[in-house]
């Protein structure tokens, strides 16, 4: 039975939406997901229904399952349905429908239709109150979206599900919870995690789970499991069962069609959780198997979209499997749904995953054992890595032994696996077999095969061939043999073959072999022999056939070794039997070649057996033919061996030769070494004399592969260095190889011979080698070509490898060409081949003749008709185009083009490697022919020839370079090797890469054979200028540079007089394309160009051409392009030395001078002369007079701008710096050639410019050209160091030599230039005697003379400015000007500068320049200028006064600035003499409104720093008080004044401060009245401005007070008090008492904050006035809130800082107590708090029983009803005062509680509710806190 609380909770939930109050109902109705509460509260259900229905319809279009809710939750009847009046069953069904809808809507919460539909459920059915848990569960995956916040917001707190309490805080903040909070909730509340997990399970059951939900659950679960990894007990007990249950449902195949789309996501979620579980907790073997079975039970887990993830999770699971193979049935069961064929289908995926370091081995190992044996087991085994695990090897050995008698298909799998095990770790496998009481031989017998190549297992020194039992078959063995023979029914087995040495007997041999192995598999070796003998006797019709069968058994590797050895023994037995039973002697030596092949067997014991057989033959032959007597014998098995071979082709030796052969073969145990190492047979075989007999038999074409492959290997090894023996096989095996290959592969596979390694490799080894038989060699070449062209990849690879070994052994070029051509054809074909023909070709050593022949075979030009010898200029032929249009010719040309490309690539590789001397004129001639052919193919055939042309050009370059580096002397055919052919190709090609490479060909050809290139120089240069320079890549740039570097020297070396014309033509071509050259490449390109051509021959030409480009841009108004040209020229010139640049400028001037002055006639001599030079051309010669004049002017401007740029930059690469480095280098003598050259260049240019000036001034008058020449001259001379420069210009500045206005302009420009030069270059470091002499003795006198003459205003200004710069620079750097001589000169200058022509002139510019000059002189001479002081300061101040009302603001600003600078200089240099003018100086500085404040501030700082502080302070006070500076309209000026005042006060010493204190107090009083002044002047300044200024006044006042002692300050303070109270000393009679008191107390309050208790006693001066003012406030006589506030704050501060019981003195207490308390009667609301603070501070300060008693009764008076005039406001403020007092005083005032209790009680019953509440909520609570108990019992 539930508790009462649970019952109440249920009732509450059911009635959550039942409210009777209309306001509460409205509040519930206003909760909305979409609308604002105010809007929502007014909406009716009809509107909301339509909105929800609209959302439902849209959702139904997305998912049709939503449509069923149209008849329930969204039916028309739902509009009027009220869940609060429904029955329990109806509500239950309603809740189910709601839950179903919400779970279905889960994926779509972020969509607007879903929000609309859920809005209806919230508003109508109140699901936010009744179904909140489901609403939150379904929306939880959307926790980071805005819809989740909306859902949180609509759920009321009182209806919030308890399990979701963790999210309530985010509901209050209207924020999305972070993922960390959700993880924390899952971690801290297992029930919450379980709830959501079970909810997910229900979703899976119902088919409503979705991707976002799976992602949410996965991320949180993974993090939860990781966080619980250190609390495994909790994890295993609580969370693990829940997680496993969820995983189980996730792995179940879904029955819902709707989940098909996320089936993969569901499965991946389960996989991820499983992987995490496996990594953090130890999983039992049963659980791993269960997981595996569950994963594989769904067929879709192995579909392509899931198989990768399935394999990964299985591998991760089985990594942690700790079981063994004991529970095999369970392991087999868990893998039942993973058929091996399915795994093999994704074999490549498994390998990729293993390569990606996924740990698959354990999973694959157990899976292999679980599915073994199976037809796919071997493929699975290849994926397994058993390592060195004895457990795994033991288990697999057990499985193999148990399944060794399986079906044929599975047995072959077992055989393959056994062979792999022997290869990987034979020792461990044999050891594992031993544990199963099995060995290799026994296993081979069970499997009826030989296990691979087991020579390494069985070939040991203690294993010997045992033939000793041949004659000892006991009766018991015979009896057993008979039994087995009878059981096998041998009589029913008969052979029809005559011989088993032929391939035709293969099928019968295979059948008989199976019967034989079945017969022998379970018997001992002794019984094997007997049975085998019976088998041969019974089955075969003749003894020869039986012996051939036995021999073939012994040769077949797939037959178990024990049977093979038995067959050898039986062979010997049968040979003996044949010898003894024959009536005639039998010669057995025809078997020697076959037995020799047996000696080459891989197994040592087999080799030993065949050696025994050879010995037996030797014994037999010796016994027959040992005597010299001829014995007629029979050749045993001749027909069986040779079959149908003609007798003439049987190379059979005679018996005597046979005897000799056997003795030689077995002499001194020759074959004993072969038993140990079979490879020793090859050299011994090569020494045999009668080996023709042997090889003839080996080469019989009908022999099976089991015999042949050994013969091929022996001869192939012998053929390493070449042998004629190989030709025995040419006509038989090689010629028939391609027809027999498939049959041989089958034979090899049946015999378990590795065909591709052992057979095919040996056959290929028979091909090639040294030989003199050209016919046979040609046959071999054809065979090689056929092999390379075959479809057999292994053969291609083998032949390719062999070809690399033997290629150079082919003596004839024809054979090698055939092979090379075939390789090229293979490359040209589109069919895939295994080997890389190009790699082969590149590896082969190809000589010059071979390349020329191969190139000659590629007749690309021969396909095109009408192609004659290459012409100088080839034009396209229409007939050629028509021919190329034919498809067959076009295809043929394309094929040959591909071949050519291959050959050229190959040639390039060989030329680069340089292994052979390939390069020659003949090769180059062939390449040139191809160059022409490629032009035809590209232009007429439209074939893609670009790559071929690039390759061809590379080959040409390499060939030329190789020949150039060779010591040989080459002769070239000029008819075939022609530069014009290259030029034609360059022009016709559209590829920059091809063009660049061909340019490099020309470059290299020019250095090798310059005579070939000389005739094509012009076209080359034209092309480079038109195309190459425009390319923006490093290759083009490099090609261009190399071409120029090699062609130009070739032209120069030719001795042609036209080199300058060639250079001009080249540069013209390049400069014409200047705008198209990438900007970042221009400088490097032209620098390299000029360096290559020689700066003396080309620099001036380039400058001239660039000048033309500059003029052209100006004429077209392309100013940006003109500026680019200037920037380029400046950067370009930095790469050259000073002398190179100067010579270039000098020669440029000569070219400029050659520009015609007037228009030329067409056929005049000058016209013809200039027209031959490309740098002039028609563009200049066709100009009119005005055009020529403009060209000259703009060319001058161009070069002048370039020189000016050189002057303005100061880096180390400029011309100016380079000139200075030479001329000023003291280590270089004046006679040095470089220095002379530089000065000579300057003289030449200057002389030219001066002569040109004369020409255009006097002869051909042109003022613009003359001015341009002057500018250039000035800029050019500016390149010189200072003293050189001064020497060159000072005469031009002498006004006495001026002849016209042009001279004035020139002088002005030169003097301005000089000033700039001095400004930038003069310093203490570089001023020396030469500079001093030039400037002081030459330049300054000339300037002074010009100033005095005053020829021109602008000239006068320029002279004054330069004069000032010189004086400033010298004055700052040296003391030269301070000498008497120079001082007199400067004073004389000062006289002239202060005259009417300068300082007193009417020109602002002249005035400014004069002031600057005066400033510079004063700065140097200082006090020496005192004599002229009256001519400086008073005029300057008068001039300043004229600027205050000037209309020209710019001039006024400059004049004011210059005057202020002058004054600052005077103040620094002669401060004592400036005292008398201090007032004027201050007014001048402070009132210079046009000058920036920062400048004026610094000058004012100089005044304060350098002048006497007393005088400065006095002056400042004077201009304020007497000259009324406060009337200045600019607050910024007043601010500057106050800053200066502050600085002065800070600097002044205390003694001076005391002296000037009276003056300062007077200033301070007047400053306090500034507010009144402003108000009187119609509120001149706003309130904020006045506040800022008053703050500065107070700061100055306090700073000054700090300088005074108490004795000095008290009378001053009294003066201030009298001014404030009585108005004494006031400057404004209208100033009111309130205004004065406010100003005073503002200042006083700040003083108190600064000085604290030091000035508490000063209140004595204020006590009575303050008490009086307070009384007037309480009585209502005075009303001013601001004053009252300031006054109360003043008292509070005084009370607070009183440390000497100043206010505890009775008289003072009595004076202030009542006036202060009386303020409670009418204190204003806004400042009451200040009164409370003041009273509290007062009581705290004067704390004593007597005073407290007085204060208590004083306060009671204002709360008691006894005083009838106490207003509610008075009571409230008094209550607040008491509250503050109790808070401050605490227990000290509890003694007065009995006195206060009655009044408190009375106040609690006051008629005014506000009073009652103030007491109850304020005072009572404070007292209770202090008292520590309720106040009720005292009140009662």
UniProtKB/Swiss-Prot annotation:
Residues annotated as signal peptide: none
| Bilayer disposition of the protein | Multi-pass membrane protein
Recorded GO MF terms: U3 snoRNA binding
- Membrane-spanning segments: 998-1018, 1085-1105
The Gene Ontology biological process terms listed for this entry are: endonucleolytic cleavage in 5'-ETS of tricistronic rRNA transcript (SSU-rRNA, 5.8S rRNA, LSU-rRNA); endonucleolytic cleavage in ITS1 to separate SSU-rRNA from 5.8S rRNA and LSU-rRNA from tricistronic rRNA transcript (SSU-rRNA, 5.8S rRNA, LSU-rRNA); endonucleolytic cleavage to generate mature 5'-end of SSU-rRNA from (SSU-rRNA, 5.8S rRNA, LSU-rRNA); positive regulation of transcription by RNA polymerase I
Q: Which ranges does the UniProt record give for the HEAT repeats?
A: 245-283, 585-623, 813-850, 1333-1372, 1749-1787, 1790-1828
Q: Where is the composition biased (Acidic residues)?
A: 461-473
GO cellular component labels? 90S preribosome; membrane; preribosome, small subunit precursor; rDNA heterochromatin; small-subunit processome; t-UTP complex
| Magnesium keyword on record | no
| Region (Disordered) location | 453-473, 863-883
Q: What is its subcellular localisation? A: Nucleus, Nucleolus; Membrane
- Which UniProt key words apply to this protein? Membrane, Nucleus, Repeat, Ribonucleoprotein, Ribosome biogenesis, rRNA processing, Transmembrane, Transmembrane helix
One Pfam match: HEAT_HEATR1
- Protein role: Involved in nucleolar processing of pre-18S ribosomal RNA. Involved in ribosome biosynthesis.
Q: Which family does it belong to?
A: Belongs to the HEATR1/UTP10 family.
Subunit description: Component of the ribosomal small subunit (SSU) processome.
UniProt name for this protein: U3 small nucleolar RNA-associated protein 10
Source species: Scheffersomyces stipitis (strain ATCC 58785 / CBS 6054 / NBRC 10063 / NRRL Y-11545) (Yeast)
């Amino acid at each position: 039975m539930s508790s009462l609380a649970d019952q109440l909770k249920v009732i509450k939930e059911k009635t959550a939406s039942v409210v009777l109050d209309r306001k509460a109902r409205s509040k519930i109705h206003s909760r909305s997901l979409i609308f604002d509460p105010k809007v929502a509260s007014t909406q009716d259900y009809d509107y909301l229904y339509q909105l929800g229905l609209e959302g439902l319809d849209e959702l139904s279009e997305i998912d049709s399952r939503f449509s069923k809710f149209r008849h329930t939750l969204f039916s028309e009847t739902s509009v009027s349905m009220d869940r609060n009046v429904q029955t329990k069953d109806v509500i239950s069904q309603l809740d189910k429908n709601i839950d179903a809808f919400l779970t279905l809507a889960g994926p779509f919460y972020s969509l607007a239709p879903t929000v609309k539909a859920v809005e209806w459920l919230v508003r109508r059915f109140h699901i936010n109150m009744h179904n909140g848990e489901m609403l939150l569960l379904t929306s939880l995956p959307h926790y980071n979206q805005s819809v989740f916040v909306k859902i949180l917001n609509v759920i009321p707190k009182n209806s919030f599900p308890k399990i979701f309490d963790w999210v309530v805080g985010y509901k209050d903040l209207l924020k999305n919870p972070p993922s960390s909070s959700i993880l924390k909730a899952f971690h801290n509340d297992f029930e919450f995690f379980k709830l959501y997990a079970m909810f997910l399970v229900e979703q899976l059951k119902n088919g409503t789970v979705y991707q976002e939900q799976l992602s949410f659950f996965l991320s949180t679960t993974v993090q939860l499991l990781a966080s619980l990894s250190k609390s495994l007990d909790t994890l295993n007990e609580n969370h693990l069962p829940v997680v496993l249950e969820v995983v189980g449902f996730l792995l179940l195949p879904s029955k819902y069609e709707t989940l098909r789309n996320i089936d993969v996501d569901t499965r991946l979620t389960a996989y991820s959780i499983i992987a995490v579980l496996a990594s953090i907790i130890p999983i039992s073997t049963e659980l791993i198997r269960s997981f595996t079975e569950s994963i594989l039970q769904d067929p879709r887990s192995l579909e392509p979209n899931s198989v990768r993830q399935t394999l990964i999770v299985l591998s991760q699971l089985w990594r942690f499997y700790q079981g063994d193979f004991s529970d095999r049935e369970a392991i087999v069961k868990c893998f039942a749904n993973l058929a091996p064929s399915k795994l093999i289908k994704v074999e490549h995926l498994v390998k990729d995953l293993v390569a990606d370091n996924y740990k698959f081995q354990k999973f694959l190992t157990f899976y292999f054992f679980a599915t073994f044996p199976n037809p796919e087991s071997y493929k699975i085994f290849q994926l397994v890595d058993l390592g060195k695990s004895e457990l795994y090897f033991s288990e697999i050995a057990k499985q193999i032994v148990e399944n060794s008698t399986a079906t044929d298909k599975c047995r072959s799998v077992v055989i393959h696996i056994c062979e792999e095990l022997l290869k990987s770790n034979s020792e461990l496998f044999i050891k594992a077999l031993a544990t199963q009481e099995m060995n290799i031989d026994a296993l081979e017998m069970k499997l009826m095969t030989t296990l691979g190549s087991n020579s390494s297992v069985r070939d040991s020194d203690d294993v010997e061939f045992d033939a000793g039992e041949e004659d000892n078959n006991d009766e018991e063995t015979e009896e057993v043999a008979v039994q087995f023979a009878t059981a096998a029914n041998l009589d029913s087995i008969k052979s029809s073959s005559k011989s088993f040495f032929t391939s035709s007997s293969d099928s019968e041999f295979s059948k008989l072999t199976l019967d034989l192995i079945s017969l022998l598999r379970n018997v001992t070796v002794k019984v094997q022999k007997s049975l085998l003998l019976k088998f041969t006797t019974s089955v075969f019709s003749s003894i020869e056939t039986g012996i051939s069968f036995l021999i073939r058994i012994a040769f077949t590797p797939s037959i178990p070794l024990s049977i093979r050895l038995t067959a050898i023994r039986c062979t010997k037995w049968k040979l003996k039997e044949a010898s003894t039973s024959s009536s005639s002697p039998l010669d057995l030596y025809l078997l020697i070649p076959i037995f020799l092949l047996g000696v080459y067997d891989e197994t040592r014991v087999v080799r030993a057996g065949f050696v025994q057989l050879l010995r037996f033959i030797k014994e037999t032959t010796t016994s027959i033919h040992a005597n010299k007597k001829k014995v007629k014998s029979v050749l045993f098995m001749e027909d069986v061996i040779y079959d149908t071979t003609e007798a003439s082709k049987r190379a059979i030796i005679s018996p005597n030769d046979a005897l000799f052969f056997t003795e030689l073969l077995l002499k001194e145990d020759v074959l004993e070494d072969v038993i140990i190492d079979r490879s020793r047979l090859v050299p011994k075989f090569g020494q045999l004399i009668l080996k023709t007999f042997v090889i003839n038999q080996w080469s019989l074409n009908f022999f099976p592969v089991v015999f042949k492959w050994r013969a091929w290997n022996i001869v192939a090894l012998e053929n390493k260095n070449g042998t004629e023996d190989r030709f025995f096989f040419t006509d038989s095996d090689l010629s028939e190889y391609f027809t027999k290959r498939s049959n041989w592969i089958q034979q090899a596979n049946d015999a378990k011979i590795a065909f591709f390694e052992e057979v095919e490799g040996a056959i290929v080894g028979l091909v090639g080698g040294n030989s003199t038989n050209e016919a046979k060699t040609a046959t071999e070449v054809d065979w090689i070509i056929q092999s390379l062209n075959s479809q057999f990849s292994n053969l291609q690879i083998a032949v390719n490898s062999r070809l690399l070994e033997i290629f150079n052994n082919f003596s004839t070029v024809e054979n090698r060409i055939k092979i090379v051509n075939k390789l090229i054809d293979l490359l040209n074909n589109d069919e895939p081949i295994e080997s890389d023909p190009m790699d082969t070709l590149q590896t082969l050593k190809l000589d010059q003749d071979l390349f020329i022949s191969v190139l000659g075979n590629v007749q690309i030009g021969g396909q095109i008709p009408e192609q004659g010898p290459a012409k100088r200029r080839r034009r396209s032929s229409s007939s050629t185009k028509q021919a190329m249009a034919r498809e067959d010719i076009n295809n043929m040309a394309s094929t040959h083009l591909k071949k050519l490309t291959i050959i050229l690539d190959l040639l390039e590789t060989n030329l680069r490697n340089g292994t052979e001397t390939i390069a020659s004129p003949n090769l180059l001639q062939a390449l040139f022919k191809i160059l022409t052919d490629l032009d035809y193919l590209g232009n007429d055939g439209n074939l893609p020839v670009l790559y071929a042309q690039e390759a061809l050009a590379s080959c040409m370059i390499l060939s030329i370079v190789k020949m150039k580096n060779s010591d040989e002397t080459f002769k070239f055919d000029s008819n075939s090797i022609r530069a014009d052919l290259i030029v034609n190709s360059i022009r016709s090609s559209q590829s920059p890469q091809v063009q660049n490479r061909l340019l490099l060909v020309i470059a290299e050809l020019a250095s090798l054979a310059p005579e070939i290139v000389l005739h094509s120089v012009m076209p080359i240069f034209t092309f480079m200028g038109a195309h190459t320079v425009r390319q923006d890549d490093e290759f083009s740039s490099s090609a261009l540079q190399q071409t120029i570097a090699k062609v130009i020297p070739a032209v120069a070396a030719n001795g042609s007089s036209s080199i300058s014309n060639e250079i001009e033509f080249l540069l013209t071509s390049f400069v014409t394309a200047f705008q198209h050259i990438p900007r970042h490449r221009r400088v490097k390109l032209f620098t390299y160009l000029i360096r290559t051509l020689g700066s003396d021959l080309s620099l001036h030409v380039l400058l001239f051409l660039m000048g033309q480009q500059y003029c052209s841009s100006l004429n077209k108004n392309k100013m940006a392009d003109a500026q680019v040209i200037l920037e380029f020229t400046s950067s370009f010139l930095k790469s050259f030395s000073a002398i190179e640049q100067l010579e270039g400028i000098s020669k440029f001037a000569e070219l400029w001078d050659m520009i015609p002055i007037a228009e030329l006639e067409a056929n005049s001599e000058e016209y013809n002369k200039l027209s031959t030079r490309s740098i002039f051309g028609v563009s200049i010669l066709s100009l009119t007079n005005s055009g020529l004049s403009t060209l000259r002017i703009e060319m001058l401007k161009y070069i002048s701008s370039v020189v000016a740029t050189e002057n303005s930059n100061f880096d180390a690469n400029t011309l100016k710096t380079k000139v200075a480095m030479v001329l000023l280098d003291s280590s270089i003598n004046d006679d040095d050639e470089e220095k002379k050259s530089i000065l000579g260049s300057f003289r030449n240019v200057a002389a030219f410019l001066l002569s040109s000036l004369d020409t255009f001034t006097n002869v051909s008058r042109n003022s613009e050209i003359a001015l341009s020449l002057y500018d250039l001259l000035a800029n050019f001379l500016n390149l010189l160091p200072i003293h050189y420069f001064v020497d060159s210009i000072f005469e031009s500045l002498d006004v006495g030599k001026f002849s016209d206005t042009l001279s004035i302009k020139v002088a002005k420009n030169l003097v301005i230039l000089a000033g700039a030069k001095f400004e930038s270059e003069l310093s203490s470091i570089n001023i020396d005697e030469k500079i001093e002499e030039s400037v002081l003795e030459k330049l300054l006198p000339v300037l002074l003379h010009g100033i005095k003459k005053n020829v021109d205003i602008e000239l006068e200004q320029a002279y004054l400015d330069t004069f000032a710069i010189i004086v400033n620079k010298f004055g700052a750097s040296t003391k030269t000007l301070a000498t008497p001589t120079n001082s007199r000169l400067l004073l004389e200058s000062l006289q002239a500068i202060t005259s009417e022509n300068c300082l007193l002139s009417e020109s602002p510019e002249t005035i400014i320049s004069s002031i600057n000059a005066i400033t510079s002189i004063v700065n140097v001479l200082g006090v020496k200028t005192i004599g002229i002081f009256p001519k400086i300061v008073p005029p300057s101040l008068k001039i300043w006064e004229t600027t205050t009302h000037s209309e020209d603001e710019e001039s006024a600003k400059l004049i004011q600035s210059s005057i202020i600078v002058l004054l600052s200089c005077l103040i620094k240099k002669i401060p004592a003499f400036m005292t008398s003018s201090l007032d004027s100086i201050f007014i001048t500085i402070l009132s210079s409104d046009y000058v920036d404040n920062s400048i004026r501030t610094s000058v004012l700082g100089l005044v304060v720093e350098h002048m006497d502080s007393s005088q400065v302070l006095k002056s400042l006070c004077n201009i304020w008080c007497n000259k009324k500076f406060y009337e200045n309209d600019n607050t910024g000026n007043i601010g500057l004044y106050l800053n200066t005042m502050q600085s002065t006060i800070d600097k002044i010493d205390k003694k001076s401060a005391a002296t000037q204190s009276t003056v300062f107090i007077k200033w301070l009083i007047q400053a306090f009245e500034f507010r009144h002044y402003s108000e009187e002047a119609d509120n001149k300044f706003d309130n904020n401005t006045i506040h800022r200024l008053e703050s500065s006044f107070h700061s100055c006042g306090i700073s000054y007070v700090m300088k005074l002692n108490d004795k000095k300050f008290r009378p001053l303070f009294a003066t201030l008090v009298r001014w404030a109270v009585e108005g004494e000393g006031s400057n404004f009679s209208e100033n009111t008492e309130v205004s004065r008191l406010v100003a005073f107390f503002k200042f006083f309050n700040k003083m108190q904050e600064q000085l604290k208790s030091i000035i508490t006693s000063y209140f004595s001066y204020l006590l009575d006035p303050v008490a009086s003012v307070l009384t007037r406030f309480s009585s209502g006589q005075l009303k001013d809130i601001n004053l009252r506030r300031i006054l109360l704050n003043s008292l509070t501060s005084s009370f607070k800082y009183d440390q000497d019981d100043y206010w505890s003195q009775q008289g003072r207490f009595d004076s202030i107590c009542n006036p202060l308390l009386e303020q409670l009667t009418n204190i204003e609301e806004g400042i009451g708090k200040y009164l409370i603070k003041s009273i509290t501070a007062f009581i705290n300060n004067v704390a004593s029983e007597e005073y407290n008693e007085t204060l208590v009764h004083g306060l009671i008076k204002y709360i008691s009803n006894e005083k009838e005039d106490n207003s509610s406001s008075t009571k409230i403020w008094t209550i607040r005062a008491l509250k503050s007092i109790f808070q401050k005083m605490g227990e000290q005032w509890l003694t007065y509680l009995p006195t206060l209790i009655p009044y408190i009680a009375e106040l609690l019953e006051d008629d005014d509710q506000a009073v009652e509440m103030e007491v109850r909520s304020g005072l009572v609570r404070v007292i209770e806190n202090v008292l520590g108990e309720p106040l009720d019992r005292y009140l009662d």
